[in-house]
Amino acid sequence: MRILFMGTPDIAAECLKALYAAGHDICAVYTRRDKPVGRKQVLTAPPVKEVALAHGTPVFQPRTLRDGSEDENIRALAPELIVVVAYGCILPKSVLETPKYGCINLHVSLLPKYRGSAPVQWAVLNGDAETGVSIMQMDEGLDTGDVLCCEKIAIDPEETSGELFDRVTAVGARVLCEVVPAIAAGTLTPQPQDLSLIHISEPTRRS
């Protein structure tokens, strides 16, 4: 499938690697801009950019997508599907409606639980017994789209959020590669999120 990938940090880079390995046509990559890092403030590329350039894939780093400045370029790229993993920019309706199969997002929680940022850290801080990954069909809301697929992941009470995140990343990359061909085959049934399960939890204080 011809995919436009949007993502920035390590988890996105691992997902992008998995899509390359699965043989998908990554027509281009959108990521955030290079940032100064460390005491010497060395300008550093996002992990996703490094992976894309290593594969010879065009990389775009606009400040925003919301002003419509990238609409024409995205249409010209003619993606069948846009895959978003921790990109960091909001996709406007004009972008969401461009691909044949729309836009999907990998979120590292069992939606609708822990919508928004840092879901793995929240799960650990709150002492949850499990977390998971969800892949949703994106709409104009924040993590509000219909869920295409989810997979539960047990949390070891002794593991750190970093250790759990590594496991979640591996599962997320695998599930993403399973979902893409299923989308093309039309074998997935989008499920609306159960709004009764939405809650905002405060982290548990630990001594």
Where are these regions (language model features)?
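N-terminal Rossmann-like dinucleotide-binding module
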Residues: 1-40
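Internal alpha/beta domain cores that form substrate/cofactor-binding pockets in large enzymes
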Residues: 2-4, 27-29, 58-77, 82, ...
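Amphipathic, non-transmembrane alpha-helical secondary structure
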Residues: 13, 17-21, 72-75, 93, ...
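Structural motif corresponding to alpha-helix initiation and N-cap regions
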Residues: 13, 42-45, 67-71, 89, ...
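A generic structural signal for well-ordered alpha-helical segments
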Residues: 19, 52-57, 128
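Donor/substrate-binding cores of folate-linked one-carbon enzymes
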Residues: 22, 81-196
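N-terminal beta-loop-helix "entrance" segment that forms/cooperates
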Residues: 35-53
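Single conserved hydrophobic/aromatic residue that forms the stacking wall/gate
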Residues: 198-207
